[in-house]
């Protein structure tokens, strides 16, 4: 009698070809790859997977960082972990399309989740678990405008030589690293933790910069006064605070009910004041709603603007009153 199959057992992943973007693959149509089965542990699901290594041209050697299953779940490249369709970070894509991160982060739940999705992908006609067509029109238009249409091969360049920066490199032309000083916005190789954050779309500095610039271009620049934590929804239909709260959570899945301090609706002006507990959450919600072109409440699209600080009472009147003669 054969042994019972344990569905919770940590498995392995085997593939014949990687899932890569055009930039990571390089300009050479005759690239040669080295294949190593179970060569490394996937950065996301921690399963041994087939690792591919290649030289994309004159740049450094590159390799796959996550397994093909995790890449199919998110629709990303196995090396740079950017979206395959738009070439943008997953945090930008998910914010524009109002997608919720459903993948669990705990070890046991990840294994169970991966195994179930593998079974679903095996039965699906295209073998994929990510559907990029299910999205609102405004979000897709924003992604198309921000998408990089041509491959950016400079991303494949070797890293900067740290010894050259210190003035201690003695290898000269034989050094495999770049001999130039780093720029202010140039970052080093991301760590494993930052790769995982990029995959799940959280705490990604590149995505935050893209979303902030997009919000500023649409008039949603965050005010300098850090005490302002209010967003104003304009052009609302007849609704109550529960409708506004449900629309906000649906458009911004990262917003929890506890993050919203209060919602005040002014029916005469068809607007609502949404007060957040923290300024960072208000900024993140503003960036996401700007990417979606506003927020839809009860079938009507509403405009989003930042609130203003309340005018402080002038202390001069009180001082003048106290200084008046008796």
From Swiss-Prot:
Involved in pre-mRNA splicing. Facilitates the cooperative formation of U2/U6 helix II in association with stem II in the spliceosome. Binds to RNA. GO terms for cellular component: Prp19 complex; U2-type catalytic step 1 spliceosome; U2-type catalytic step 2 spliceosome. Disulfide bonds: none annotated. Keywords: Metal-binding, mRNA processing, mRNA splicing, Nucleus, RNA-binding, Spliceosome, Zinc, Zinc-finger. Coiled coil: none annotated. SMART domains: ZnF_C3H1 (SM00356). GO terms for molecular function: pre-mRNA binding; U6 snRNA binding; zinc ion binding. InterPro entries: Cwc2/Slt11 (IPR039171), Nucleotide-bd_a/b_plait_sf (IPR012677), STL11/RBM22-like_N (IPR048995), Torus (IPR032297), Znf_CCCH (IPR000571), Znf_CCCH_sf (IPR036855). Associated with the spliceosome. Its main location: nucleus. Pfam families: STL11_N, Torus. Gene3D superfamilies: 3.30.70.330, Zinc finger, CCCH-type (4.10.1000.10). It is found in: Nucleus. Belongs to the SLT11 family. This is Pre-mRNA-splicing factor SLT11. GO terms for biological process: mRNA processing; RNA splicing. A zinc finger (C3H1-type) spans 155-182. PROSITE patterns: ZF_C3H1.
């Amino acid at each position: 009698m054969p042994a019972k199959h344990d569905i919770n057992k940590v498995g392995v992943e085997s593939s014949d070809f990687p899932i890569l973007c055009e930039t990571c693959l390089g300009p050479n149509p005759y690239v040669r790859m080295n294949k190593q089965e179970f060569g490394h542990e996937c950065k996301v699901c921690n399963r041994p997977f087939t690792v591919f290594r290649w030289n994309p041209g004159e740049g450094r050697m590159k390799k796959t960082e996550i397994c093909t299953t995790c890449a199919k779940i998110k629709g990303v490249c196995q090396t740079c972990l950017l979206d395959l369709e738009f070439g943008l970070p997953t945090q930008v894509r998910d914010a524009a399309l109002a997608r919720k991160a459903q993948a669990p982060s705990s070890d046991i739940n990840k294994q169970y989740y991966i195994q179930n999705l593998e079974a679903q992908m095996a039965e699906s006609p295209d073998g994929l678990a990510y559907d990029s067509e299910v999205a609102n029109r405004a979000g897709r238009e924003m992604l198309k405008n921000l998408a990089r249409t041509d491959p950016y091969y400079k991303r494949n360049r070797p890293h900067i030589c740290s010894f050259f920066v210190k003035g201690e490199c003695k290898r000269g032309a034989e050094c495999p690293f770049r001999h130039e000083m780093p720029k202010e916005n140039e970052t080093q190789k991301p760590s494993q933790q930052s790769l995982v954050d990029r995959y799940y779309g959280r705490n990604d500095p590149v995505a935050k910069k893209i979303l902030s610039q997009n919000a500023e271009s649409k008039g949603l620049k965050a005010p300098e006064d850090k005490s302002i934590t209010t967003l104003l929804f304009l052009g609302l239909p007849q609704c109550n605070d529960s409708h506004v709260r449900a629309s906000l959570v649906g458009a911004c899945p990262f917003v929890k009910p506890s993050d919203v301090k209060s919602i005040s609706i002014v029916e005469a002006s068809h607007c609502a004041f949404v007060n957040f507990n923290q300024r960072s959450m208000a900024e993140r919600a503003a960036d996401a709603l700007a990417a979606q072109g506003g927020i839809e409440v009860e079938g009507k699209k509403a405009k989003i603007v930042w609130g203003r600080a309340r005018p402080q009472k002038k202390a001069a009147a009180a001082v003048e009153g106290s200084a008046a003669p008796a």
